[in-house]
Amino acid sequence: GDGGAIFTDDDHTADPIRSLCVHGKGPGGKYDNVRVGMNSRLDAMQAAVLLPKLKALGDYEIDARQQVVERYGRAFAGKLTTPFVAEGCVSAWAQYALLAADTAQRDKIVAHLKEAGIPNMIYYPTPQHALPVFWDEPHYGETFRNADDYCARTFSLPMHPYLEQAEQQQIIDAVLEAL
């Protein structure tokens, strides 16, 4: 299944996040729902399984992912729009998303990767504002230029801490061949 974690040292940020994870519960207790939330808590068994993973994440995995990011970034600089992380921030790099020049270039790269047997993903084929959940909202049907553009051009490459250098090079070569 899916899971996640949010780390912050800011109580102003942490409090609403905790609330969202418990059905939007407010300070008044169980039935004091102050926002729309969901049940996003882990049970004890899931937490026990994930605890060693947190240690690996801190000890090795983020650094290993960062090395892949740096290698991808050097290979694609000036050819595709590469992701960045703002100064003072750290990314766990769950995905490595690139932006092609246009949809045609993105589709050509994605097809070439598929043909080469290299997994890739278009995580956001439909902009969030165009999803059915928002069809009844007042803004539905409006154009959100940046979101529309991003969804038309983005795709993601394999990203994990155990991606061997030879695999990274195969991915890089396949993307560059498609350009």
Residue positions per predicted region:
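Glycine-rich phosphate-binding loop of ATP-grasp-fold ATP-dependent ligases
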Residues: 1-6
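PLP-dependent aminotransferase class I/II
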Residues: 9-179
